[in-house]
């Protein structure tokens, strides 16, 4: 499945801890999910999943409640999902997933970031075909064979189950992520550090220090944009 999840999550954790924007971005995602269905997570599986992810990211309860209350109060903002793909230096690729109430603003901002930070924005599909949309489940554990048996019995379509640094890391088909979570909960596993849909690069590149500095600036600028929810790339040494 490419580089170890421990390496990916170390970078994600460092970025999450370095910015206060993560709370605001989860607030938008929770609001959007609540607006698209019932504002009750027990009646809205999409909302329930976002809230679970927010809790894993240690988003405070008051941030979650505020977003749901805003949706209940009839907030009139409509958010649209988007995906932008492009290239950095020396074979590096990048995908930015967005959630925005103003598509024109987002397109302009993302294009400007690519242009100013040494990248080139591409057409839809120009990069994403080199990534696999994958369900990722991570929790504390050291027996991947036992976990694989649990998932197999529940007929979950699993790509891989590994043990990394005291964690079980499960990669599923994207359509079976929720089924996998349900199977684990039924087996008594209820504490997860990650339950995400991720775009994982099929192959990776290593950049020189000079190119890495440029690419990191591009990634950081995209992640700092209010409308960008997730950034994926294929650089092994970032």
Curated annotation (Swiss-Prot):
GO molecular function, one term: DNA binding
InterPro entries documented for this protein: Integrase-like_N (IPR017856), TACO1_YebC-like_2nd/3rd_dom (IPR048300), TACO1_YebC_N (IPR049083), Transcrip_reg_TACO1-like (IPR002876), Transcrip_reg_TACO1-like_dom3 (IPR026564), Transcrip_reg_TACO1_YeeN (IPR026562), YebC-like (IPR029072)
One Pfam family per UniProt: Transcrip_reg
GO biological process: regulation of DNA-templated transcription
Annotated signal peptide: none
Record keywords, A-Z: Cytoplasm, DNA-binding, Transcription, Transcription regulation
Gene Ontology cellular-component annotations: cytosol
Compartments in which it is found: Cytoplasm
Family: Belongs to the TACO1 family. YeeN subfamily.
PANTHER family: TRANSLATIONAL ACTIVATOR OF CYTOCHROME C OXIDASE 1 (PTHR12532:SF0)
Name of protein: Probable transcriptional regulatory protein YeeN
Organism in which the protein naturally occurs: Escherichia coli (strain K12)
Source organism phylogeny: Bacteria, Pseudomonadati, Pseudomonadota, Gammaproteobacteria, Enterobacterales
């Amino acid at each position: 499945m490419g580089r170890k999840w421990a390496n990916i999550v170390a970078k994600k954790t460092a970025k999450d801890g370095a910015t206060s924007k993560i709370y605001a971005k989860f607030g938008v995602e929770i609001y959007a999910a609540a607006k698209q269905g019932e504002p009750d997570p027990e009646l809205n599986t999409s909302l329930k999943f976002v809230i679970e992810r927010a809790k894993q990211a240690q988003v405070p309860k008051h941030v979650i409640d505020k977003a749901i209350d805003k949706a209940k109060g009839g907030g009139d903002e409509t958010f649209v999902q988007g995906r932008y793909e492009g290239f950095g230096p020396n074979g590096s690729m990048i995908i930015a997933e967005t959630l925005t109430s103003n598509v024109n603003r987002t397109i302009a901002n993302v294009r400007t970031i690519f242009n100013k930070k040494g990248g080139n924005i591409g057409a839809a599909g120009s990069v994403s075909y080199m990534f696999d949309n994958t369900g990722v489940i991570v929790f504390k554990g050291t027996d991947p064979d036992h976990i694989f048996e649990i998932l197999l019995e529940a007929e979950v379509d699993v790509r891989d189950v590994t043990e990394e640094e005291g964690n079980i890391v499960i990669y599923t088909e994207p359509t079976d992520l929720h089924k996998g979570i349900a199977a684990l909960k039924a087996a008594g596993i209820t504490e997860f550090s990650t339950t995400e849909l991720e775009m994982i690069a099929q192959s990776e590149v290593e950049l020189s220090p000079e190119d890495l500095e440029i690419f990191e600036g591009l990634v950081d600028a995209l992640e700092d944009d209010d409308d960008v929810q997730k950034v994926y790339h294929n650089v092994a040494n970032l």
